[in-house]
């Protein structure tokens, strides 16, 4: 709405009646009068101050453009005189005297301001009780929120918090609620713009709004704890050793519907202070080494779930089962080994060979199984190099040393 403000500092004189409506506004100690269109509301052809479809409206447009006619000047001066008399109530700071129309209006001639082709009218201000006056529709915040929830478009999504400053200008509500739209701005952020012909209404977040992933393919990461239990008799742990019931983080990666589980490789610490008699001196077979570990250090940080955690060497080397026979101080890591050892002291041999004509008996079941191979001729242990077979595993271990240290190297060592 365009307001034409005219300062009432000059002296005007006219006995005619006003035309149109009045809006008085006081700024400080100076009185201003707001001049709307003097044309009637019922005249649809002259509903805009800029439309010139009738002689009266043409005269009004000419006075806005700077060329005032005598009749239009008289009507405006009559309107200002009567309204100033009613508004001031006899106590206005401006005095009304005799002055000619063209001389009084001349200093305030200016070019017409660009206005929209719409008709605006100011409400009347009666002198009665202000509570009884019908006021324009002003919705509350609850009504606006309900309207937005019912009529918000599904394409409108929640805007990130960093762009809240950009949406402050769009959050002012007008008298009638309207829908708001989001358009991508030139700087990469989202900006709010009102629909054509109306003001924007605040609220850029729908009831089910969420962030819209417009970037690359989403990758979902989920961390799950995996408990790793240790034996209860491990004793005091060193500073570099993990405590009991350690939870190792398991990472689940979901890429395009396919889930991959990654777990860190548990590398045994090298700073274990163990007695020398518990240290293994036998070489570890190549196939028994964990994947990814080499002489230069551990392998990659993550392995697939198919690989098992390597056992803690400290838990394997600690012998907690001690022989109670007088004069014997042997200790074993397993109770079954201790029971087999006690049979040697007692002389008990419960495992007997069932081969015809053989009456051998043994205190351990593995000894009986090894003895049966001597009757059947089965040799399950085969050398991977020369494919030679053996009935006992210890015989195979001794044979592998031949391939590790050939006869030529051994002969050279003996000569040196």
Swiss-Prot record:
Cite the record's Basic and acidic residues compositional bias ranges: 156-168
Region named Disordered = 156-219
Q: Which gene encodes it?
A: KLF15
Q: In which tissues is it expressed?
A: Highly expressed in liver, skeletal muscle, and kidney. Expressed in cardiomyocytes. Expression is highly reduced in cardiac tissue of patients with non-ischemic cardiomyopathy and aortic aneurysm, and in glomerular disease. Not expressed in bone marrow or lymphoid tissues.
Tell me the GO BP annotations in alphabetical order.
cardiac muscle hypertrophy in response to stress; cellular response to peptide; glial cell differentiation; intracellular glucose homeostasis; negative regulation of peptidyl-lysine acetylation; podocyte differentiation; positive regulation of D-glucose import; positive regulation of transcription by RNA polymerase II
Instruction: Offer a single GO CC term for the protein.
Output: nuclear speck
Q: Which segments show compositional bias classed as Gly residues? A: 199-212
Outline the subunit composition. Answer: Interacts with MYOCD and EP300.
Molecular-function annotations in GO: DNA-binding transcription activator activity, RNA polymerase II-specific; DNA-binding transcription factor activity, RNA polymerase II-specific; RNA polymerase II cis-regulatory region sequence-specific DNA binding; RNA polymerase II transcription regulatory region sequence-specific DNA binding; sequence-specific double-stranded DNA binding; transcription cis-regulatory region binding; zinc ion binding
Record-linked Gene3D superfamilies:
Classic Zinc Finger
Record-given protein name: Krueppel-like factor 15
What inducers act on this gene? In podocytes, up-regulated by retinoic acid.
Q: What is known of its domains?
A: The 9aaTAD motif is a transactivation domain present in a large number of yeast and animal transcription factors.
Species the sequence originates in: Homo sapiens
Q: What is its main location?
A: nucleus
